[in-house]
Amino acid sequence: MATQPTKDKIISSSWELLEELPLTDFSMRKLASRLGMTVSSLYYHFSSKEALFAELIDKASLEIIFPANEKTWQDRLFVYGKNIYSVLEAYPNLAQLMMDYPPESENYLRLFDKLLMIVDDLKLSDDHKFYTINLFLNFIYTSKIDRDRLVEQPEKPVSTVKTPLVQLAPFLYKYWRTESLTSLGSSESFEFGLQLIISGIEKMLKIN
């Protein structure tokens, strides 16, 4: 009798499948086929696809290093943002998973909690602190998703409108002619975005 795959093997095979397929095409049936097991046996380990995804997010979240050596909230947010992005780069479709599924697993909840801890002493309302961290995470996720799309489709999209772009959208055309569009997924673009968010928080603190 063949040995049934372990939970760790199921998780590693899930990442392999996500490397090959978009998230929307992932299914428990395809995963079971890859592992050489029945779907019912797979459901013995994970009650649903959502439960499996929660486990993937949880294990990946554990690898995100908290910037304990940074002294200011600005530096902590900046470095933490880079650390989050680094882990997103290590796992296929993780950014989309974390965007699509709310923080319910232990380590994902801890990640959110540590981010809230960084801004806890700021002179903002609790609602605004929560909005800030939600925006911060969404920026990180969408930056990685945009980067993945640029890797998959490195060529600039072809406009379908008949009017020349230089006439239709002259300001956009200026950037279209340069590398601005393809540099959106660069580390420079990402770090600028982090700094922009942090500067915006500083501005709000002065207003308050």
Question: Could you describe each region identified by the protein language model?
Answer:
Residues 1-21, 25-30, 34, 47-54, ...:
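Basic, helix-initiating cap at the start of DNA-binding domains
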Residues 10-18, 56, 60, 84, ...:
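Short hydrophobic clusters on alpha-helical segments that form packing/core surfaces
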Residues 36-46:
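Short hydrophobic/aromatic patch on the recognition helix
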Residues 58-63, 71:
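Short, basic, alpha-helical segments at the C-terminal edge of helix-turn-helix-like DNA-binding modules
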Residues 66-110, 114, 136:
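Hydrophobic alpha-helical connector segments
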Residues 111-161, 201-204:
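Hydrophobic alpha-helical bundle segments that form small-molecule/ligand-binding pockets
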Residues 153-208:
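C-terminal peripheral helix-coil segments that are non-catalytic and often amphipathic
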